[in-house]
């Protein structure tokens, strides 16, 4: 009889097998045409996005972060080729959708080299999982939903919907469920699958086969309003879906009695179980059967269950972030070095008692840095002063005009436009040896932390506006940052030229 294999050896072999599996999953299967995105073998589930044939984990080699490699397959190559331009137009516009509570679509390209045509697009990877998964874990651990967390989540979802609905024409999500809403470890909410409804509506009938409606899944039927599929999609569709998500967040799970489909009775029981009358009224107005009676996403942000007067700290944080491009990256650290920590920051007078003083030493600068990062990431949107239209709204997702035959003339190849915003600007000017020009060094820090350093020999005839416009034209600067950079350069030119006069 053979002696049993020693336990340490078996453990080592199992560990080796796990390492081999891990290496297999990290194998690079494919690379984007530009070489930046590398598709891995490991498949990921980003909320059962309908219509996606495959979703893989990928690596952004420029930023060193994980992203998602999504693929849409089209078997009919002829039909695909006939509508290729329309598909490109839709994705060009989707890349422009930029909001902290919406999963970002970074890049797309078409692949027609194989028998099956593909649309490949890269999206942000949300590693913490879907809202549905989080709610299941919370319920399993026998924990109740915290009312403050519920309000914060609702505010972030409505912030994203308000942005989409304020576009011209409005962007209808049309597939909002707890499977397509994601939550990060820090409480940041991200809405995914924004592309699905727009893309499926833009496609002709002969290309819609790979786009499967989420409504085919019985377990998610209750997220869709009664009028769904019978009338043209409107913003009220998303409000109903949001109301069902808000209800599910409040009760953690809507019981199904073992059935696959969530029944009206189960939804009614969940509504009646809510102890907060304001929360119940808020959800009921979203779930109104008549779409005309459902409020807008923007007006829901002012409902008494969500509305609160923003603290001065939050207002200051938003103001700080909006103007951060004028400050060095480590501005908090630099300012605290020069600060007298024993100095009085604020004083509260008290009758017949000494005033209550608050000193700089009592401020946790580490907590302040974390708070600023949370505000920057979109966890605390500033909604009480929000305009009815999002600032810097791109001209996105307008229905394509009627096919007009245009005479094709040779035109230069357009440059890729920059989609990332600038969060910090630094500029330095040095006089050339011949004193005839200035040597400009410009550092732009983009929102994904990419540092872009540009140099330019400035002539006396060059203007700040022309320079900013040129950077936009050649794809070095986002269009929304044109005026901001022009003003920054103008003030820098005046300062340097004034000292040299």
From Swiss-Prot:
Tell me which stretches of the chain form a coiled coil: none
Positions where Phosphothreonine occurs in the chain: 409, 411
What residue intervals traverse the membrane? none
* Compartments where located: Cytoplasm
Composition skew (Acidic residues), residue ranges: 20-30
Per UniProt, the ranges with Basic and acidic residues bias are 7-19
> One matching Pfam family, short form?
Pkinase
The residues covered by the Protein kinase domain are: 38-306
This protein's superkingdom?
A: Eukaryota
Alphabetically sorted, this entry's keywords are: Cytoplasm, Neurogenesis, Phosphoprotein
Any one annotated GO CC term: cytoplasm
The record's family statement is:
Belongs to the protein kinase superfamily. Ser/Thr protein kinase family.
Instruction: Outline what the protein does.
Output: May regulate apoptosis of neural progenitor cells during their differentiation.
Q: What is known of its domains?
A: The protein kinase domain is predicted to be catalytically inactive.
What protein is this chain from? Nuclear receptor-binding protein 2
Q: Write the lineage as a comma-separated list.
A: Eukaryota, Metazoa, Chordata, Craniata, Vertebrata
């Amino acid at each position: 009889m053979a002696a049993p294999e020693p336990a340490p050896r078996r453990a080592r072999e199992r560990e080796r097998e796990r390492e081999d599996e891990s290496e297999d999953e990290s194998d690079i299967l494919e690379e984007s045409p530009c070489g930046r995105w590398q598709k891995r073998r490991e498949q990921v589930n980003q909320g059962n996005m309908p219509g996606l044939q495959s979703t893989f984990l990928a690596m952004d080699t420029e930023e060193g972060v994980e992203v998602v490699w999504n693929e849409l397959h089209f078997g009919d190559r002829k039909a695909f080729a006939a509508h290729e331009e329309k598909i490109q137009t839709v994705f060009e516009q989707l890349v422009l959708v930029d909001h902290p509570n919406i999963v970002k679509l970074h890049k797309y390209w078409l692949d027609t080299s194989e028998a099956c045509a593909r649309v490949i697009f890269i999206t942000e990877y949300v590693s913490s999982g879907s809202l549905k998964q989080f709610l299941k874990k919370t319920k399993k651990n026998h924990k109740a939903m915290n009312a403050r967390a519920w309000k914060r989540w609702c505010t972030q979802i409505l912030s994203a919907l308000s942005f989409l609905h304020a576009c011209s024409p409005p962007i209808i999500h049309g597939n909002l469920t707890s499977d397509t809403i994601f939550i990060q470890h820090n409480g940041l909410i991200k809405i995914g699958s924004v592309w699905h409804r727009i893309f499926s509506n833009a496609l002709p009938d002969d290309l819609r086969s790979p786009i499967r409606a989420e409504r085919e899944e019985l377990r998610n039927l209750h997220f869709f309003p009664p009028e769904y599929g019978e009338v043209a999609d409107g913003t009220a569709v998303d409000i109903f879906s949001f109301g069902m998500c808000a209800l599910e967040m409040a009760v953690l799970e809507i019981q199904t009695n073992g059935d696959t489909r969530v029944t009206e009775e189960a939804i009614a029981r969940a509504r009646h179980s809510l102890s907060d009358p304001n929360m119940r009224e808020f959800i009921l107005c979203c779930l109104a059967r008549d779409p005309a009676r459902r409020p807008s996403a923007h007006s829901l942000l002012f409902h008494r269950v969500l509305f609160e007067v923003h603290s001065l700290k939050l207002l200051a944080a938003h103001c700080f972030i909006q103007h951060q491009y004028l400050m060095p990256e480590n501005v908090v650290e630099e300012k605290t070095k020069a600060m007298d920590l024993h100095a009085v920051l604020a004083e509260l007078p008290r009758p017949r008692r000494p005033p209550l003083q608050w000193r700089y030493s009592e401020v946790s600068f580490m907590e302040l840095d974390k708070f600023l990062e949370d505000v920057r990431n979109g966890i605390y949107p500033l909604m009480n002063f929000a305009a009815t239209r999002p600032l810097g709204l791109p001209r996105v997702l307008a229905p394509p005009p009627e096919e007009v035959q245009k005479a094709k003339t040779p035109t230069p190849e357009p440059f890729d436009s920059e989609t990332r915003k600038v969060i910090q600007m630094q500029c330095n000017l040095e006089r050339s040896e011949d004193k005839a020009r200035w040597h400009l060094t410009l550092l732009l820090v983009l929102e994904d932390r990419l540092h872009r350093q540009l140099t330019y020999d400035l002539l006396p005839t060059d203007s700040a506006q022309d320079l900013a416009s040129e950077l936009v034209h050649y794809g070095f600067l986002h269009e929304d940052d044109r005026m901001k950079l022009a003003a920054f350069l103008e003030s820098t030119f005046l300062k340097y030229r004034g000292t040299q006069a």
